Protein backbone atom coordinates (compact mmCIF):
# COMPACT_ATOMS: atom_id res chain seq x y z
CA UNK A 1 0.00 0.00 0.00
CA UNK A 2 1.31 3.44 -0.95
CA UNK A 3 1.65 5.67 2.08
CA UNK A 4 0.17 9.17 2.17
CA UNK A 5 2.96 11.76 2.30
CA UNK A 6 2.04 14.53 4.72
CA UNK A 7 3.82 17.79 5.43
CA UNK A 8 3.26 19.64 8.69
CA UNK A 9 3.14 23.41 8.21
CA UNK A 10 3.97 25.15 11.49
CA UNK A 11 5.69 23.66 14.50
CA UNK A 12 3.99 24.96 17.63
CA UNK A 13 1.91 22.69 19.86
CA UNK A 14 -0.41 21.53 17.08
CA UNK A 15 2.53 20.93 14.74
CA UNK A 16 4.43 18.87 17.33
CA UNK A 17 1.44 16.67 18.07
CA UNK A 18 0.67 16.35 14.35
CA UNK A 19 4.17 14.95 13.83
CA UNK A 20 3.63 12.50 16.72
CA UNK A 21 0.28 11.40 15.25
CA UNK A 22 1.83 10.89 11.80
CA UNK A 23 4.67 8.86 13.32
CA UNK A 24 2.07 6.54 14.87
CA UNK A 25 -0.05 6.21 11.70
CA UNK A 26 0.98 3.20 9.58
CA UNK A 27 -0.60 4.60 6.40
CA UNK A 28 1.25 7.96 6.53
CA UNK A 29 4.82 9.09 6.13
CA UNK A 30 6.19 12.51 6.97
CA UNK A 31 7.22 14.39 3.82
CA UNK A 32 8.71 17.16 5.96
CA UNK A 33 8.02 20.02 8.32
CA UNK A 34 7.69 23.66 7.27
CA UNK A 35 8.88 26.27 9.79
CA UNK A 36 9.51 30.00 9.34
CA UNK A 37 13.18 29.52 10.27
CA UNK A 38 13.57 26.34 8.20
CA UNK A 39 16.21 23.97 9.58
CA UNK A 40 17.95 26.68 11.64
CA UNK A 41 17.92 25.53 15.29
CA UNK A 42 16.22 22.33 14.12
CA UNK A 43 14.66 20.51 17.11
CA UNK A 44 16.29 17.14 17.84
CA UNK A 45 13.01 15.26 17.43
CA UNK A 46 12.87 16.45 13.79
CA UNK A 47 16.33 15.09 12.96
CA UNK A 48 14.94 12.25 10.78
CA UNK A 49 12.85 14.68 8.71
CA UNK A 50 13.43 17.35 6.12
CA UNK A 51 12.72 20.76 7.66
CA UNK A 52 12.29 23.70 5.27
CA UNK A 53 10.96 27.25 5.20
CA UNK A 54 8.75 26.72 2.13
CA UNK A 55 6.59 23.71 1.27
CA UNK A 56 7.75 23.94 -2.36
CA UNK A 57 11.15 22.66 -1.18
CA UNK A 58 9.57 19.30 -0.24
CA UNK A 59 8.90 16.59 -2.81
CA UNK A 60 5.79 14.52 -3.48
CA UNK A 61 3.55 16.02 -0.79
CA UNK A 62 0.00 14.62 -0.86
CA UNK A 63 -1.45 16.65 2.02
CA UNK A 64 -0.40 19.57 4.21
CA UNK A 65 -1.54 19.72 7.81
CA UNK A 66 -1.87 23.43 8.58
CA UNK A 67 -0.64 23.81 12.16
CA UNK A 68 -0.37 27.58 11.87
CA UNK A 69 -2.15 30.25 13.90
CA UNK A 70 -5.81 29.89 12.92
CA UNK A 71 -6.09 33.32 11.29
CA UNK A 72 -3.38 32.29 8.79
CA UNK A 73 -5.05 29.03 7.68
CA UNK A 74 -7.11 30.52 4.81
CA UNK A 75 -4.05 32.13 3.18
CA UNK A 76 -1.91 29.01 3.60
CA UNK A 77 -4.72 26.79 2.26
CA UNK A 78 -5.11 28.98 -0.82
CA UNK A 79 -1.35 29.08 -1.53
CA UNK A 80 -0.79 25.37 -0.93
CA UNK A 81 -3.76 24.12 -2.95
CA UNK A 82 -2.46 26.19 -5.90
CA UNK A 83 0.50 23.78 -5.79
CA UNK A 84 -1.88 20.82 -6.16
CA UNK A 85 -1.53 19.79 -2.50
CA UNK A 86 -4.56 18.92 -0.34
CA UNK A 87 -4.90 20.61 3.07
CA UNK A 88 -6.31 19.87 6.52
CA UNK A 89 -6.69 22.47 9.28
CA UNK A 90 -8.37 23.21 12.60
CA UNK A 91 -9.51 26.75 11.70
CA UNK A 92 -11.64 27.86 14.66
CA UNK A 93 -12.89 31.37 13.95
CA UNK A 94 -16.56 30.36 13.94
CA UNK A 95 -17.94 33.53 12.34
CA UNK A 96 -15.60 33.24 9.32
CA UNK A 97 -15.98 29.50 8.61
CA UNK A 98 -18.69 29.80 5.94
CA UNK A 99 -16.78 32.50 4.03
CA UNK A 100 -13.57 30.47 4.28
CA UNK A 101 -15.37 27.32 3.10
CA UNK A 102 -16.91 29.10 0.11
CA UNK A 103 -13.65 30.69 -1.00
CA UNK A 104 -11.60 27.55 -0.44
CA UNK A 105 -14.13 25.36 -2.27
CA UNK A 106 -13.67 27.59 -5.33
CA UNK A 107 -9.89 27.18 -4.99
CA UNK A 108 -10.28 23.41 -4.64
CA UNK A 109 -12.41 23.13 -7.79
CA UNK A 110 -9.90 25.20 -9.74
CA UNK A 111 -6.89 23.19 -8.50
CA UNK A 112 -8.58 19.76 -8.23
CA UNK A 113 -7.62 19.50 -4.56
CA UNK A 114 -9.43 18.82 -1.30
CA UNK A 115 -9.38 20.95 1.87
CA UNK A 116 -10.75 19.65 5.16
CA UNK A 117 -11.35 22.76 7.26
CA UNK A 118 -12.22 23.28 10.94
CA UNK A 119 -11.37 19.68 11.80
CA UNK A 120 -10.20 20.35 15.34
CA UNK A 121 -12.03 20.15 18.65
CA UNK A 122 -14.45 23.09 18.46
CA UNK A 123 -15.47 23.36 15.75
CA UNK A 124 -14.80 19.77 14.82
CA UNK A 125 -15.14 16.64 16.95
CA UNK A 126 -16.98 18.44 19.75
CA UNK A 127 -19.49 19.86 17.27
CA UNK A 128 -20.18 16.39 15.82
CA UNK A 129 -20.73 14.88 19.29
CA UNK A 130 -23.06 17.77 20.23
CA UNK A 131 -25.18 17.20 17.09
CA UNK A 132 -25.31 13.44 17.77
CA UNK A 133 -26.47 14.07 21.34
CA UNK A 134 -29.13 16.48 20.10
CA UNK A 135 -30.34 13.80 17.66
CA UNK A 136 -30.47 11.17 20.43
CA UNK A 137 -32.15 13.46 22.97
CA UNK A 138 -33.89 16.20 20.97
CA UNK A 139 -35.79 17.53 24.00
CA UNK A 140 -32.73 17.74 26.24
CA UNK A 141 -30.29 20.56 26.84
CA UNK A 142 -27.05 20.40 24.89
CA UNK A 143 -24.58 22.68 26.60
CA UNK A 144 -20.88 22.51 25.92
CA UNK A 145 -18.71 23.74 28.77
CA UNK A 146 -15.04 24.46 28.21
CA UNK A 147 -12.31 24.73 30.81
CA UNK A 148 -10.89 25.37 33.15
CA UNK A 149 -7.74 25.50 31.09
CA UNK A 150 -5.55 27.36 28.65
CA UNK A 151 -6.99 28.46 25.32
CA UNK A 152 -4.20 27.97 22.77
CA UNK A 153 -5.89 29.96 20.02
CA UNK A 154 -6.73 32.96 22.19
CA UNK A 155 -3.24 32.92 23.73
CA UNK A 156 -1.70 33.00 20.23
CA UNK A 157 -3.88 35.97 19.25
CA UNK A 158 -2.96 37.87 22.43
CA UNK A 159 0.77 37.17 21.83
CA UNK A 160 0.48 38.53 18.28
CA UNK A 161 -0.39 42.04 19.50
CA UNK A 162 2.34 44.66 19.17
CA UNK A 163 3.86 45.37 22.57
CA UNK A 164 3.05 41.94 24.07
CA UNK A 165 6.05 39.85 25.09
CA UNK A 166 4.00 36.84 26.28
CA UNK A 167 0.35 36.07 26.97
CA UNK A 168 -1.87 33.40 28.47
CA UNK A 169 -5.61 33.11 27.90
CA UNK A 170 -7.59 30.97 30.35
CA UNK A 171 -11.12 29.65 29.81
CA UNK A 172 -13.15 29.42 33.02
CA UNK A 173 -16.55 27.63 32.82
CA UNK A 174 -19.55 29.35 34.39
CA UNK A 175 -22.02 26.57 33.49
CA UNK A 176 -24.86 26.18 30.99
CA UNK A 177 -22.49 26.70 28.06
CA UNK A 178 -21.25 30.06 29.32
CA UNK A 179 -17.60 30.69 30.10
CA UNK A 180 -15.33 33.54 31.07
CA UNK A 181 -12.05 34.32 29.37
CA UNK A 182 -9.18 35.64 31.48
CA UNK A 183 -6.18 37.00 29.57
CA UNK A 184 -2.83 37.68 31.21
CA UNK A 185 -0.15 39.58 29.31
CA UNK A 186 3.50 40.42 29.88
CA UNK A 187 4.33 43.65 28.12
CA UNK A 188 7.53 44.29 26.22
CA UNK A 189 9.84 46.91 27.72
CA UNK A 190 8.43 50.36 27.01
CA UNK A 191 4.97 49.12 25.95
CA UNK A 192 1.88 50.66 27.54
CA UNK A 193 -1.17 48.59 28.47
CA UNK A 194 -3.52 51.20 26.95
CA UNK A 195 -1.81 50.77 23.56
CA UNK A 196 -2.01 46.97 23.68
CA UNK A 197 -5.68 46.60 24.67
Model features per residue range: what roles?
Residues 1-29:
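NAD(P)+-binding Rossmann beta1-loop-alpha1 motif at the extreme N-terminus of oxidoreductases
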Residues 9, 13, 17, 135-197:
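Active-site-lining helix/loop region of Rossmann-like oxidoreductase modules
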Residues 17, 24-45:
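NAD(P)-binding Rossmann-fold cofactor-contacting core
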Residues 37-54, 156-157:
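N-terminal beta-loop-helix "entrance" segment that forms/cooperates
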Residues 51, 87, 114-115:
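Hydrophobic beta-strand scaffold residues
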Residues 53-82, 94-98:
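Beta-loop-alpha module in the N-terminal Rossmann-like domain of NAD(P)-dependent dehydrogenases
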Residues 91-115:
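Rossmann-fold NAD(P)-binding glycine/threonine-rich loop
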Residues 111-152:
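Adenosine-phosphate binding glycine-rich loop
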Amino acid sequence: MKKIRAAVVGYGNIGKFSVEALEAAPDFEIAGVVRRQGDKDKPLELEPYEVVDDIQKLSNVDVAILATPTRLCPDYAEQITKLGINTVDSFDMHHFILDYRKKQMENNKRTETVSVISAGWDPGSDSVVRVLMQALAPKGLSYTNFGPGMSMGHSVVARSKKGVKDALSMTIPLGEGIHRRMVYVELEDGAKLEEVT
